[in-house]
Amino acid sequence: MYNWKYQFNQKDLKKAQDLTLVNVERKDDTITADIKDSEFKIEVQIKYNSPYYILCNCNQKGSCHHEAAFWYYVEEHPELFKTPQKDIDEDYYYNELYRITDSGKGQDYQYHEILDFDRMAGSLSRFIAEDIENLLNDGGYKLACELLCRVSDLLSDEYAVDSDMWYDVAEAFCQCAYPLTESIHIDDDLAGKLDGKISDVTQYGV
């Protein structure tokens, strides 16, 4: 599970353990909750069935102990983000990405092993927006991370960044990948790997 505690200082983590969340309600991609015996409320935006953005009405700058209390609640109630188990055809996704990569093997590849990013860009954008999004909706979080890491390798190629279509694909990649680095459904090692791949892409100015 995502190591959320690094966001908080030890004082706030300790204070959070004395708090109780009540009236916890999930509706679509939003969770609301009250802090018992107080006027403070929590609102949580969800992305890929995982907490993504947390807002507290205490107006403290940075992360507060009320938000930490929510994370403790998540640890105690994993059913809040339980993902239905669906059969996922991993070969389909790997084969589709291979097909897209293969489509970039033009004349330059034959002689210099340089992929033509322009020939792949449209298909890569669709792969991220449709295939990987569908995969995430089906609970294939780890596979999605591995696929995004491979997409980042294509984006980080020194010849790819010269393409006029590079920015649009890179932006789609980042919008999909960023939330996964803080997902409760993947471990720290995989999140760290994906975060490094994001850095490889964003160094070019996304």
Where are each of the predicted segments found?
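Long, low-complexity, compositionally biased intrinsically disordered regions
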Residues: 1-206
